[in-house]
């Protein structure tokens, strides 16, 4: 087991938290301006933006089951997490090219595949690292670092936009800067030691469904209805811009 830190959680939990912190800084620097860049610089329609965002959300969940199943079957966590974070970083490099509808749409959808691959194995890795009595606290620390990145990223974007103005050159600068924390996250993850779990078979989906409690199954219905009302935050950014907010204030 990893040595506890002064925060009362294993050091590797904090390392994985730093990975999420850096990744979210990178991603949120991009997400804050993506919709505006897609529609105003690349010339994409809002309808097409909605399609791209929908495909991106689908991609973000498309490989969850496979990644979790294969991670359990092999007893490995780090290769899946490293592949997911590495893939997302690689896709962000597409933004270095001249922005077009095709390149921006390709980035947005393919980059989310990395999230789908890394999510379940990383969470299983966290659960294996943390002491059982403090597992909830360990996940809380990791989530806090993740959310901190989601705050820092837009603040950086705000500063760059306020300094340089909302121009195509500024968007290109933001996309280039976003690669720095993304690359750093992969380097940090590469240094985290992996403790392999014993390989185990995962129950068939039908068997696993039957094992779920009736209360949980009833919860899925309202949760699904709430999800149906979800809309891309990009539309909120566009609406705020149309109402007269400055681009940096929208971010």
Question: Where are the model-predicted features located?
Answer:
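Helix-loop boundary and gating motifs at the non-cytosolic
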Residues: 3-61, 216-251
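Transmembrane alpha-helix termini and helix-breaking/packing motifs in multi-pass membrane transporters
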Residues: 36-41, 152-175
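Helix-to-loop junctions at the C-terminal end of transmembrane segments
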Residues: 63-76, 161
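Cytoplasmic helix-loop-helix junction between adjacent transmembrane helices
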Residues: 107-147
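C-terminal membrane-cytosol helix-exit motif in multi-pass small-molecule transporters
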Residues: 179-200
């Amino acid at each position: 087991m990893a040595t506890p830190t002064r925060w009362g959680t294993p050091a590797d939990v904090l390392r994985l938290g730093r990975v999420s912190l850096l990744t979210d800084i990178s991603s949120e620097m991009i997400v804050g301006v993506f919709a505006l860049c897609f529609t105003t610089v690349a010339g994409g329609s809002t309808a097409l933006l909605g399609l791209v965002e929908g495909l991106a959300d689908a991609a973000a969940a498309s490989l969850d089951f496979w990644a979790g199943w294969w991670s359990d079957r092999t007893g490995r966590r780090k290769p899946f997490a490293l592949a997911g974070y590495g893939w997302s970083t690689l896709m962000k490099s597409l933004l270095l090219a001249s922005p077009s509808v095709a390149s921006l749409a390709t980035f947005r959808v393919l980059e989310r595949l990395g999230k789908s691959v890394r999510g379940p194995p990383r969470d299983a890795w966290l659960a294996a690292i943390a002491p059982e009595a403090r597992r909830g606290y360990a996940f809380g620390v990791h989530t806090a670092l993740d959310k901190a990145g989601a705050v820092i990223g837009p603040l950086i974007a705000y500063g760059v936009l306020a300094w340089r103005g909302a121009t195509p050159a500024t968007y290109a600068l933001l996309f280039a800067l976003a690669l720095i924390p993304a690359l750093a996250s992969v380097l940090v993850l590469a240094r985290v030691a992996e403790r392999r779990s014993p390989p185990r078979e995962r129950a068939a989906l039908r068997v696993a469904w039957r094992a779920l409690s009736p209360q949980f199954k009833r919860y899925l219905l309202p949760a699904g209805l709430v999800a149906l009302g979800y809309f891309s935050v990009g539309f909120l950014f566009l609406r705020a811009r149309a109402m007269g907010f400055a681009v940096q204030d929208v971010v």
